[in-house]
């Protein structure tokens, strides 16, 4: 089946197609088994063609962003992993609005907004990854959240391009709920006019804060757990005494207790075991069950 699917992918798509691709190459944690196929569609039309082919053949798939909030288990991923990296268009619109594709990096997006004097999403400068990934998890920092600036979300579902205004979205702290099979391809954002120098100063301040508080020095996925209501996950972890705790090559960062880092040679199983140890300790001490902020996928 994989040989037949590979032949059709190569014949019917224009984007890059990789076979038996180690997901450790595509995640910031640098762990994860191989995907049967790793496909980067050339554009929206290519993505539409790919989804039609996968539906026809009954092939499972998983969409990924920049891999910064993703933990892939050591058994890898069956079917097709879809990268939206080539959906990287940015278009300036009237009225302080910008359309950004899902594959645009947060850094690129923030730089464009700064240069054009458009404020409101400066906090994205310290969040690695892509606009699509930021939307999918409603990324936020410094009191801001990305979906709050969305005017219209662009998605594809069942081969149809959809446009949904923010009032029609179901979202909250670190989540944006989509229909099964619905894929984010971009969004139109409404920003505020602002002086580019003031925007740049805010960006510099956010980056300075990030460097001071999150300089961990090893591969990581950012905050591993969501903050429970009314408190911070890092504080709960720190109070258990697990800062610096290690399982195999995975370790609780000495610099930030909610960052789990790859000290070298870590496996996904190491991270999962360490996360379980943390959660058990926090629950025993406080009664709180921590919820992972990272997305955990793949086979054992």
Swiss-Prot record:
Subcellular compartments: Cytoplasm
GO cellular component, one term: cytosol
EC number: 1.3.1.98
Active site: 174, 223, 293
InterPro entries: FAD-bd_PCMH, FAD-bd_PCMH-like_sf, FAD-bd_PCMH_sub1, FAD-bd_PCMH_sub2, MurB, MurB_C, MurB_C_sf, Oxid_FAD_bind_N
GO molecular function: FAD binding; UDP-N-acetylmuramate dehydrogenase activity
Cofactor(s) required, per the database record: FAD
Known pathway: Cell wall biogenesis; peptidoglycan biosynthesis
UniProt KW keywords: Cell cycle, Cell division, Cell shape, Cell wall biogenesis/degradation, Cytoplasm, FAD, Flavoprotein, NADP, Oxidoreductase, Peptidoglycan synthesis
Reaction(s) the record says it catalyses: UDP-N-acetyl-alpha-D-muramate + NADP(+) = UDP-N-acetyl-3-O-(1-carboxyvinyl)-alpha-D-glucosamine + NADPH + H(+)
GO biological process: cell division; cell wall organization; peptidoglycan biosynthetic process; regulation of cell shape
Ranges for domain FAD-binding PCMH-type: 30-194
EC class name: oxidoreductase
Record's function text: Cell wall formation.
PANTHER family in the record: UDP-N-ACETYLENOLPYRUVOYLGLUCOSAMINE REDUCTASE
Family according to the record: Belongs to the MurB family.
Protein's name according to its UniProt entry: UDP-N-acetylenolpyruvoylglucosamine reductase
Organism of derivation: Geobacter metallireducens (strain ATCC 53774 / DSM 7210 / GS-15)
């Amino acid at each position: 089946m994989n040989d037949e699917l590979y032949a059709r992918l190569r014949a019917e798509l224009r984007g890059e197609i990789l076979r038996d691709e180690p997901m450790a190459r595509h995640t910031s944690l640098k762990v994860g088994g191989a995907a049967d196929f790793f496909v980067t569609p050339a554009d929206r039309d290519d993505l539409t063609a790919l989804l039609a082919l996968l539906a026809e053949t009954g092939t499972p798939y998983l969409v990924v962003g920049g891999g910064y909030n993703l933990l892939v288990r050591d058994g890898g991923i069956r079917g097709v992993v879809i990268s939206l990296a080539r959906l990287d268009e940015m278009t300036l619109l009237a009225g302080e609005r910008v359309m950004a594709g899902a594959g645009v990096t947060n850094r690129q997006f923030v730089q464009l907004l700064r240069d054009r004097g458009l404020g409101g999403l400066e906090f994205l400068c310290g969040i690695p990854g892509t606009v699509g990934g930021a939307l999918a998890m409603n990324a936020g920092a410094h009191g801001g959240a990305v979906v709050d600036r969305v005017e219209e979300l662009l998605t594809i579902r069942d081969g149809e391009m959809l446009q949904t205004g923010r009032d029609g979205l179901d979202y909250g702290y670190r989540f944006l709920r989509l229909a099964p099979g619905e894929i984010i391809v971009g969004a139109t954002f409404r920003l505020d006019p602002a002086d580019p120098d003031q925007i740049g100063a805010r960006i510099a301040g956010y980056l300075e804060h990030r460097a001071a508080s999150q300089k961990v020095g090893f591969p990581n996925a950012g905050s591993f757990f969501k903050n429970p209501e009314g408190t911070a996950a890092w504080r709960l972890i720190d109070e258990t005494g697990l800062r610096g705790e290690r399982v195999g090559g995975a370790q609780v960062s000495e610099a930030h207790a909610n960052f789990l880092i790859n000290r070298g040679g870590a496996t996904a199983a190491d991270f999962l075991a360490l996360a379980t140890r943390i959660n058990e300790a926090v629950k025993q001490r406080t009664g709180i069950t921590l919820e992972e902020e990272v997305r955990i996928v793949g086979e054992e």
